[in-house]
Amino acid sequence: MKTWLKIVFGVATSAVLALLVMCIVLRPSRVHNSEESTTRALTLKDILNGTFSYKTFFPNWISGQEYLHQSTDNNVVFYNIETGESYTILSNTTMKSVNASNYGLSPDRQFAYLESDYSKLWRYSYTATYHIYDLTNGEFIRRNELPRPIQYLCWSPVGSKLAYVYQNNIYLKQRPEDPPFQITYNGKENKIFNGIPDWVYEEEMLATKYALWWSPNGKFLAYAEFNDTEIPVIAYSYYGDEQYPRTINIPYPKAGAKNPVVRIFIIDATYPEHIGPREVPVPAMIASSDYYFSWLTWVTDDRICLQWLKRIQNVSVLSTCDFREDWQTWNCPKTQEHIEESRTGWAGGFFVSTPVFSHDTISYYKIFSDKDGYKHIHYIRDTVENAIQITSGKWEAINIFRVTQDSLFYSSNEFEGYPGRRNIYRISIGSHSPSKKCITCHLRKKRCQYYTASFSDYAKYYALVCYGPGLPISTLHDGRTDQEIKILEDNKELENALKNIQLPKEEIKKLKVDDITLWYKMILPPQFDKSKKYPLLIQVYGGPCSQSVRSIFAVSWISYLASKEGIVIALVDGRGTAFQGDKLLYAVYRKLGVYEVEDQITAVRKFIEMGFIDEKRIAIWGWSYGGYVSSLALASGTGLFKCGIAVAPVSSWEYYASIYTERFMGLPTKDDNLKHYKNSTVMARAEYFRNVDYLLIHGTADDNVHFQNSAQIAKALVNAQVDFQAMWYSDQNHGLSGLSTKHLYTHMTHFLKQCFSLSD
């Protein structure tokens, strides 16, 4: 349930008064023309057509100084930063000949796969057809062509070996024209998954479409096997156009249910026919009860690191294993196990962080909580207890991008104390005396406060991608001097288009409530006048480890509501949200549905005190976890909200996936946390919806938060004789895409305008 990362149409939070400290107006004035006579407000059509969407530029690095990029006319172009050389490596004609939408160059640069017939499955997974193009001869390889559709395909890190997954089994090709070698034979739809995750691991643990990993030089291939044979199945109808609907069946472990059985195997990719796959042992302290595999990291061709979690996800074990040539097995001694345990919540953030190994192939860097409860980078050589803390402070390290022999590159929200910012830092390591440098803090400071980065081999060069708060911009930099080499994308066309638009104003501030800090973003109408009264819409996600109040650029549905309809929008990061320390993050542990809701209500009361909110016109809306929070807020009995919208909400945690739910709630058993599972349902509050206008929305083919959730809410409301509105989208999943998107936002707009008594 990571909808907060994907909602395209959200972003907003609140504004203007004492009690609140530290304000920054996010949207730069350069994209706002104050001459109202020549500008217009945003329209809903602008949003639905993506008129003001921005571009980013991520180089597809193929060496320390070379990268590929797909041009606007669909040519794949090669660039050498140091020589200035540039040429088309794959023409749009070649791409079009097989209707390719994606490509992948082999490391030896002799071949490229072209991907077509994309067919989406779940959040990350899809199937596709793959054609192999011989770049030397300028033709497609016809001998021993790949089967179709393929579930996953990848090149080895060196040369041009291919590994792919077809019908849940793994195959290997030494060369693209060679016949395939079948590695696994037990793959079976919805039963045994080899090299690809099942639904719950894809969505809630790995966050990828693959579960196979090449060793650094392609000597070995590691893969996961997921056995879903005993997992309960969720079944729902897909109506299509046929006389009878078909039934979709997905092995889906809900809270407390039987989980998949996972095993990790490694096979010699050079001589796979001589020695079969070898299983990697699970640490004894993990294997003694239900457990999860959380990630795999190759260190060298003969050393691998695996991470495991207990089912109650407060204990993680990192196990380093070495290949024994004499026995042709993988040895994982207990002395090479490192335990990470949380006594106040779950292990890690949303996921347990992965290690980044240093050049000695023994020690590594990893992000986990320090003694003060903030997530920071630590250096581990022998034991976690003896870890050396690399970063510290009342802020958090977010991601380690790259470790070289003399530098460590990472992102954090340290600069100026704003949790919703991201800057890129370099720390010197190795023989140099440690020193820290912020690479991005003072680059285009007004425009850019939220960065990510993409590094070439050995961090020789890197691209910075700024997401806001001003217009996004992508730039190329020298990895040794940090000097900007060139602008890759500056969104100049978007800048010119926005000169004629009355954009809303955005502010980020914070509320102090008792000993809690609530950061919020408020989106204000262009001609905002604090002496007037405005309707207020709260946009909420609120799930554990999420963050809504970020310094990023977006022209979205809520931008339109502020610009055209004169609605004030607010987003609030309350307890349970991320990157502000464990005290705030773990406050919701085993108590979902309590503090997230309380903090939204508290913020609304503070906004009313500011004097410009019409307290008779306040609404709340959210999607997924946000739909759950908005539903509970509406049913809180406070009388604050006139109306609200819940899109694809969870209604009971017993209905949601085991890995996600149990991470934050424990098990739904009498001797664990069943009582709160029962007390935290939306249905238990059905009577309290009587005095609000409630719009309930769901897709009937939602594989993530099943339609069952909204069906149970509707049943409870009917049984309580509570009037409400509902909209379902046939055959639509959790994202409600395509034509459903336009219908959804049009429908929600009408609902809000009616609630707020706004004219059409």
UniProtKB/Swiss-Prot annotation:
State what inhibits or activates this protein: Gelatinase activity is inhibited by serine-protease inhibitors, such as phenylmethylsulfonyl fluoride (PMSF), 4-(2-aminoethyl)-benzenesulfonyl fluoride hydrochloride (AEBSF), 4-amidino phenylsulfonyl fluoride (APSF) and diisopropyl fluorophosphate (DFP), N-ethylmaleimide (NEM) and phenylmethylsulfonyl fluoride (PMSF). Dipeptidyl peptidase activity is inhibited by 2,2'-azino-bis(3-ethylbenzthiazoline-6-sulfonic acid), diisopropylfluorophosphate (DFP).
Report whether Nucleotide-binding shows up as a keyword of the record.
no
In chain numbering, where does the site feature Cleavage fall?
A: C23, I24
Q: Which reaction does it catalyse?
A: Release of an N-terminal dipeptide, Xaa-Yaa-|-Zaa-, from a polypeptide, preferentially when Yaa is Pro, provided Zaa is neither Pro nor hydroxyproline; Hydrolysis of Pro-|-Xaa >> Ala-|-Xaa in oligopeptides
User: Which molecular-function annotations from GO does this UniProt entry contain?
Assistant: dipeptidyl-peptidase activity; integrin binding; protease binding; protein homodimerization activity; serine-type endopeptidase activity
Q: Which residues lie on this side of the membrane: Extracellular?
A: 26-760
Keyword annotations for this protein, in alphabetical order, are:
Angiogenesis, Apoptosis, Cell adhesion, Cell junction, Cell membrane, Cell projection, Cleavage on pair of basic residues, Coiled coil, Disulfide bond, Glycoprotein, Hydrolase, Membrane, Protease, Secreted, Serine protease, Signal-anchor, Transmembrane, Transmembrane helix
Give all cystine bridges in this chain.
C321-C332, C438-C441, C448-C466, C643-C755
| Assembly information from the UniProt record | Homodimer; homodimerization is required for activity of both plasma membrane and soluble forms. The monomer is inactive. Heterodimer with DPP4. Interacts with PLAUR; the interaction occurs at the cell surface of invadopodia membranes. Interacts with ITGB1. Interacts with ITGA3. Associates with integrin alpha-3/beta-1; the association occurs in a collagen-dependent manner at the cell surface of invadopodia membranes.
Q: What is the protein's name according to its record? A: Prolyl endopeptidase FAP
Organism of this sequence: Bos taurus (Bovine)
Name of the gene: FAP
